[in-house]
From Swiss-Prot:
Protein source organism: Treponema denticola (strain ATCC 35405 / DSM 14222 / CIP 103919 / JCM 8153 / KCTC 15104)
Alphabetized UniProt keyword annotations: Ribonucleoprotein, Ribosomal protein
Keyword Nucleotide-binding: no
This protein's name: Large ribosomal subunit protein bL17
Listed InterPro entries: Ribosomal_bL17 (IPR000456), Ribosomal_bL17_sf (IPR036373)
Compositional bias segments (type: Basic and acidic residues): 123-161
Signal sequence, renumbered to the chain: none
PANTHER family cross-referenced by the UniProt entry: LARGE RIBOSOMAL SUBUNIT PROTEIN BL17M, RIBOSOMAL PROTEIN L17
One Gene Ontology CC term in the entry: cytosolic large ribosomal subunit
Gene symbol of the encoding locus: rplQ
Subunit structure: Part of the 50S ribosomal subunit. Contacts protein L32.
Length: 179
């Protein structure tokens, strides 16, 4: 007898489960690494592995089959032009599941689902560069908000707010006019 040989329904209706698979597979191929529960990761992994196997051979029929599972056309292009050729010499096992512990709110078993050739160091460096550029942009905007005079002679910040000084602790609170 073949008991429990199918799939895990994840306590969802069929339509909800299909939408969940599509969303998670799309996110996996977009970001190449997602954090989810262990059970969802194990189910999504099956779909992702099959799609990567199909993406190794770029045919119209394979693209159409992948488009049934992936929401965005740009992600389908990425799958066939980037991810598929990267996995060309691998015969399976394109994804890995890393257990990271239990979620604090409901103690669910949380895991990371990622592509095997995901380069964590490269992604980390890219985010550091973006953070540095955001900090420099924040400094520029904070100078503008700090009270530099505009062309009309008044700061934009002072036009819209009244400053109220609390004498007991010398703290300033901004209050919008008209409220």
């Amino acid at each position: 007898m073949k008991h429990k040989n199918g799939f895990n329904p994840l306590s969802r209706t069929t339509a909800h489960r299909r939408a969940l698979h599509r969303n998670m597979v799309t996110s996996l191929f977009k970001y190449e690494r997602i954090t989810t529960t262990k059970q969802k990761a194990m189910e999504v992994r099956r779909t992702a592995e099959k799609l990567i196997t199909r993406s190794k051979v770029d045919t119209f029929n394979n693209r159409r089959h992948a488009a049934k599972y992936i929401w965005d056309d740009d992600i389908v292009k990425k799958l066939f032009s980037d991810i598929g050729p990267r996995m060309k010499d691998r015969n399976g096992g394109y994804t890995r599941i890393l257990k990271i512990g239990f979620r604090e709110g409901d103690a669910a078993d949380v895991a990371i689902l990622e592509l095997v050739d995901y380069d964590f160091e490269k992604k980390e460096k890219d985010t550091k560069k973006k953070d540095d550029s955001k900090k420099s942009d924040d400094k520029k905007t904070s100078k503008k908000e700090a009270g530099f005079k505009s062309s009309k002679g008044e700061s934009e910040h002072k036009k819209n707010t009244d400053q109220v000084v609390d004498s007991s602790s010398n703290r300033r609170y901004n209050r919008v006019k008209g409220s």
